[in-house]
Amino acid sequence: MSVRAHRKSRSQRVLVHTTVNPSYRKVAVSTASGQGVKLEEIPCPRGTLSVADLAKYDGEDVTAIVIQQPNFLGQLEDVDAITDWAHARNIMVIASVNPTSLGILKPPGEWGAKGADIACGDCQPLGVPLSSGGPYAGFLTTRMEYVRQMPGRIVGRTVDLNGKQGFALTLQAREQHIRRGKATSNICTNQG
């Protein structure tokens, strides 16, 4: 999604810190390899990422950086400094968060001066059980300017003719039944 949203940049590089959940990194490698996106792992000598670790990427063409908060080692990242560093270089920030941690930690939308560009996570920590062995539910959110690049169907809240609240699929021009060749909804199951 970050590469699609960042079309003006020719970069296909996404930085991923080695303290991001290894399972998430494996899925990202599988998904990215078929799309020509290069995931580059940032080594983790101290268990957390610092702006000093990112200095070698100054001036390089990078599309996005993935930050997990808290990281896989249970450490808290300096999300404000990393987010501001990335945005100063026109690099999108992708936040992977545990939703239960957001009760005490700053939400991705408040990281740094502008907040993360994309936030995602697993709903299992909220007590969502497996159903016949899977799948878990997840969440994905982004800034309004990137909504059209989101995979999957988007449901919006509306009011019907009788004034009752209802829900409907929105932005359907991006759906596979409308624009098959440019659809973003055909890569997910929409279960949940």
Task: Tell what function each PLM region has.
Residues P125-G192:
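Active-site C-terminal subdomain of aminotransferase-like
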Residues R7-R10, Q35, V62, D117-G121, ...:
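Short acidic (Asp/Glu) and glycine-rich catalytic loops that position anionic groups and cofactors
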Residues H17, I42-C44, I65-P70, M92-V97, ...:
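Generic beta-strand/beta-sheet core signal
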Residues K8-R13, D61-I65, W85-M92:
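Short, surface-exposed connector motifs at secondary-structure boundaries
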Residues V16-Q75, A81:
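PLP-dependent aminotransferase-class I/II
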Residues M1-R10, G138:
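Conserved beta-loop-alpha segment that forms the PLP phosphate-binding cup at the N-terminus of a helix
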Residues S50-A52, L105, V128-S132:
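Short, charged, surface-exposed secondary-structure boundary motifs
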